[in-house]
């Protein structure tokens, strides 16, 4: 039983007016550790007991069985609990040492699937920093879902269909060069895409031409299909090279085109249920009863289907294929209205499992405060950015540890980890301004700072030649180690919070906090001092390294043993 549950149970024994779960949720962590480890505010009982909170706190402190705590004291309207440091540190260290990387593994999911729609770059366009958020948030959530006992299914819903392919075909036929595209596919295709968009602003006939080519593509015209397939194949080769660099993999690459033959069923279902109504020649579903003002546009007046039709087909396919417990869409916040419509249409169709679908939205990445745009050519391309991050990491490693044996591998882990960590430490609904120098810094709240704390611990353990004995009980009771013990003990709850909120930043902030607490401990403690407490201190280091490495893994970030 963890300490919060223990305290809630003790209070519940003498306070029938509150449920144990309610007491648990009311417990606070005092800002000053001199005021105890946990505190119960008595305000919540004042009305029911018709007594002043101070009097209630005093009464509770006297009646609680204090034998399981170092001390229980009333301070004003709070009951403050001082935990038994030696006993709890022994329990925590024993658990972490026994479990290793499986510490805090949970079984809520019982092997059920969670579908994750993530990354989803557009074919024939460069993989930019704008795509990074969906990729790294989705990848981190997959690790967190697995830690909670679910089986994640990572789906790269490629943007491999749409009018933009009509634009690209027109541009290629007008100005393209096969050899140039084969040599540098994404660069060349981007140039063509930017050029056609610029020229279409003054020449509307290009839009018409593009629409015609896309119609031919929908009708499986041979020339259009061959060009489309070529653009897709060349783009995927390049994307997969980047995914390998990021350490991200997928279970499915079924993109928009995959659902071309699955949309007629959606239209038939909507017709059969009497949900499709005509509006200005188009087919729509009214959603006013869900508080959604604009109807969902299912089919345009020219017969073309829309994103939502395709997403309805995808949702049905995924439910049938994976029978998901949850289905999440890691897509920018600007698509919020689309996903509200998607869920509402499925609900209207009678699919209550639409309640298990969540739009995991996120804010924008900017550069110098300006929004990034592929169409306008204002992009930060991921590949040169990753190369620059690795180079900067290599320079810092060279300065700190010139004799390091595997510098290239470590520089890669640090550079890539720095970019991913910086993104993930930001609350996902907030955007951030891209700043490579800040990302790769070894100081401050960064990935390299956390990685360096882990490498420092490994160095200490190597110097001491320490491996903990599984039949030994290690315990500590000094204030610095206690801060670390409390964080390690809280790790299972941190994972659950990150899971419940679809929020990797909770995990990233925990990793920063644990690294900071260890560095403070390292600065104030002679860890390798040859005294009776030495093995206890080393056991704490060992457990901290396990949890730091696991927290980083849940973020998709490596933890080098040397830096």
Swiss-Prot record:
Gene Ontology MF annotations: arginine-tRNA ligase activity; ATP binding
Subcellular location: Cytoplasm
Motif 'HIGH' region, residue numbers: 121-131
GO biological process, one term: arginyl-tRNA aminoacylation
EC primary class: ligase
Pfam families in UniProt: Arg_tRNA_synt_N, DALR_1, tRNA-synt_1d
UniProt keyword annotations, A-Z: Aminoacyl-tRNA synthetase, ATP-binding, Cytoplasm, Ligase, Nucleotide-binding, Protein biosynthesis
InterPro entries assigned to the protein according to its UniProt record, in alphabetical order: Arg-tRNA-ligase (IPR001278), Arg-tRNA-synth_N (IPR005148), Arg-tRNA-synth_N_sf (IPR036695), ArgRS_core (IPR035684), DALR_anticod-bd (IPR008909), Rossmann-like_a/b/a_fold (IPR014729), tRNAsynth_Ia_anticodon-bd (IPR009080)
One GO CC term on file: cytoplasm
Family: Belongs to the class-I aminoacyl-tRNA synthetase family.
Official protein name in the record: Arginine--tRNA ligase
Lineage of the species this protein comes from: Bacteria, Bacillati, Bacillota, Bacilli, Lactobacillales
Gene name linked to the record: argS
């Amino acid at each position: 039983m963890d300490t919060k549950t223990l305290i809630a149970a003790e209070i519940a024994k003498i306070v029938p007016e509150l449920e144990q779960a309610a007491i648990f949720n009311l417990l606070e962590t005092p800002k000053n550790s001199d005021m105890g480890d946990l505190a119960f505010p008595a305000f919540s009982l004042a009305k029911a007991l018709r007594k002043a909170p101070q009097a209630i706190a005093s009464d509770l402190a006297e009646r609680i069985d204090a034998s399981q705590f170092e001390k229980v004291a009333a301070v004003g309207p709070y009951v403050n609990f001082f935990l038994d440091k030696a006993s709890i540190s022994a329990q925590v260290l024993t658990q972490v040492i026994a479990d290793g990387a499986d510490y805090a593994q949970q079984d809520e999911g019982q092997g059920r699937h969670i579908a994750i729609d993530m990354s989803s770059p557009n074919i024939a366009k460069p993989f930019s920093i704008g795509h990074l958020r969906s990729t790294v948030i989705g990848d981190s959530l997959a690790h967190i879902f697995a830690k909670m006992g679910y089986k994640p299914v990572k789906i790269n819903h490629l943007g491999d269909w749409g009018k933009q392919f009509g634009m690209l075909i027109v541009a290629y036929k007008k100005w393209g060069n096969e050899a140039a595209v084969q040599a540098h596919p994404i660069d060349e295709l981007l140039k063509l895409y930017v050029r056609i968009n610029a020229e279409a602003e003054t020449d509307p006939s290009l839009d018409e031409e593009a629409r015609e080519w896309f119609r031919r593509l929908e009708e499986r015209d041979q020339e259009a299909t061959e060009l489309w397939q070529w653009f897709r194949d060349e783009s995927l080769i390049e994307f997969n090279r980047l995914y390998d660099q990021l350490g991200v993999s997928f279970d499915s690459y079924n993109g928009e085109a995959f659902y071309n033959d699955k949309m007629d069923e959606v239209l038939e279902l909507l017709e059969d249920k009497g949900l499709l109504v005509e509006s200005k020649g188009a087919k729509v579903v009214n959603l006013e009863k869900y508080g959604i003002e604009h109807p969902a546009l299912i089919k345009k007046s020219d017969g073309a289907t829309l994103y939502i039709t395709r997403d309805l087909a995808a949702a049905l396919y995924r439910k049938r294929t994976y029978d998901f417990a949850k289905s999440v869409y890691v897509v920018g916040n600007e698509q919020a209205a689309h996903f509200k419509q998607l869920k509402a249409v499925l609900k209207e169709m009678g699919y209550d499992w639409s309640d298990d679908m969540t739009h995991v939205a996120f804010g924008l990445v900017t550069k110098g405060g300006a929004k990034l745009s592929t169409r306008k050519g204002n992009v930060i391309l991921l590949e040169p950015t990753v190369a620059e991050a690795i180079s900067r990491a290599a320079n810092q490693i060279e300065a700190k540890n010139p004799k390091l044996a595997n510098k290239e591998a470590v520089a890669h882990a640090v550079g890539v980890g720095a970019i991913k960590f910086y993104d993930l430490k930001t609350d996902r609904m907030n955007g951030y301004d891209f700043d490579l120098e800040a990302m790769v810094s070894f100081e401050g709240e960064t990935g390299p700072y956390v990685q360096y704390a882990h490498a420092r611990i490994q160095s200490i353990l190597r110097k001491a030649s320490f491996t903990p004995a599984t039949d030994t009980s290690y315990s500590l009771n000094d204030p610095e180690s206690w801060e670390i013990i409390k964080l390690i003990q809280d790790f299972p709850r941190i994972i659950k919070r990150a899971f419940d909120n679809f929020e990797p930043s909770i995990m990233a902030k925990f990793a920063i906090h644990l690294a900071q607490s260890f560095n403070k401990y390292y600065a104030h403690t002679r860890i390798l001092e040859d005294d009776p407490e030495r093995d206890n201190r080393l056991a704490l280091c060992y457990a901290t390294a396990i949890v730091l490495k696991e927290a980083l893994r849940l973020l998709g970030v490596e933890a080098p043993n040397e830096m």
